[in-house]
């Protein structure tokens, strides 16, 4: 079993093993974000060009997601080489990953919406809107007065409901986010959406990795990604060329690093 420190050291070096592959991936990243580049350069585009760029960005989004999945697969298979870009195959894999992501996030979303209803959040909002609506006809009443006129118990009910809903939402999205990472590994390994949606096997894989080890890995990944993101932010601040470097090298580097770290971690469950 690879130590977490060694795992992340190797993952940080991984993107530099093939600069050509990194730059090719970077070009895809750059083209997918051309609208952001033009915005940063304060270049105004007409609606037709913006629509075309949006379509290209959407297509390349799935390509990049699928490519990241291929990096995870190669890492699970203990392959140290950065995989070649296959636009069609990567696009299809990106669509598969989207299906998995929707399933894993729609479950906590439904639960959170249900909790919002049970906690009285929606009814509190309706009570406040209805109460404030009574003063709408009075044009002499300003917004501040309308808000202050609402009984405190209405605001208390809203605050309590929102607090409960937010706490449940944070917990659920963290849990399902952790499950999704392993589901992504199963999709990469078996190339079947059904395997990624097999919650029993996903939980079993996490147990094989070790719950504590997995949580520590996730925290370290977040910390390192934040540090890299801050560095990337400083680079982006460089006029004109900064944003090119960010999309051509920085963002692809972080993506390859994260996917390599994930695939290597999952290989411990093999």
Where are the language model's segments positioned?
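Functionally constrained cores in energy, signaling, and assembly domains
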Residues: 33-35, 39-46, 84, 90-93, ...
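Selective recognition of hydrophobic, aromatic-rich stretches within alpha-helical transmembrane segments
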Residues: 45-76, 155-196, 232-270
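Interfacial aromatic "cap" segments that immediately flank transmembrane helices
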Residues: 2-32, 85-110, 159, 178-230, ...
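Juxtamembrane/interface motifs at transmembrane-helix termini
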Residues: 43-45, 113-114, 122, 224-225, ...
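A cross-kingdom feature marking solvent-exposed beta-strand/loop segments within repeated
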Residues: 77-85
């Amino acid at each position: 079993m690879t130590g977490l420190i060694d795992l992340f050291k190797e993952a940080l070096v991984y993107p530099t093993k093939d600069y050509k592959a990194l730059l090719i991936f970077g070009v895809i990243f750059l083209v997918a974000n051309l609208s952001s580049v033009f915005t940063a350069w304060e270049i105004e585009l007409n609606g037709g060009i913006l629509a075309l760029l949006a379509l290209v960005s959407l297509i390349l989004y799935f390509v990049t997601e699928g490519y990241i999945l291929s990096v995870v697969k190669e890492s699970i298979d203990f392959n140290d080489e950065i995989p070649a870009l296959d636009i069609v195959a990567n696009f299809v894999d990106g669509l598969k990953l989207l299906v998995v992501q929707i399933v894993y996030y729609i479950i906590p979303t439904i639960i959170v919406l249900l909790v919002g209803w049970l906690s009285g959040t929606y009814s509190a909002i309706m009570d406040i809107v209805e109460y404030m609506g009574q003063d709408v006809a009075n044009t002499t009443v300003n917004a501040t007065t309308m808000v202050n006129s609402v009984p405190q118990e209405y605001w208390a009910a809203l605050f309590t409901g929102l607090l409960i809903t937010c706490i449940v939402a944070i917990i659920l999205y963290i849990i399902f986010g952790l499950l999704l990472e392993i589901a992504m590994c199963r999709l990469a390994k078996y190339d079947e959406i059904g395997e990624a949606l097999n919650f029993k096997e996903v939980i079993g894989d996490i147990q094989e990795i070790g719950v504590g080890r997995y949580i520590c890995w996730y925290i370290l990944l977040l910390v390192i990604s934040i540090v890299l993101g801050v560095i990337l932010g400083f680079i982006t601040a460089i006029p004109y060329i900064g944003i090119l470097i960010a999309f051509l090298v920085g963002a692809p580097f972080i993506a390859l690093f994260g996917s390599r770290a994930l695939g290597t971690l999952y290989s411990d469950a093999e």
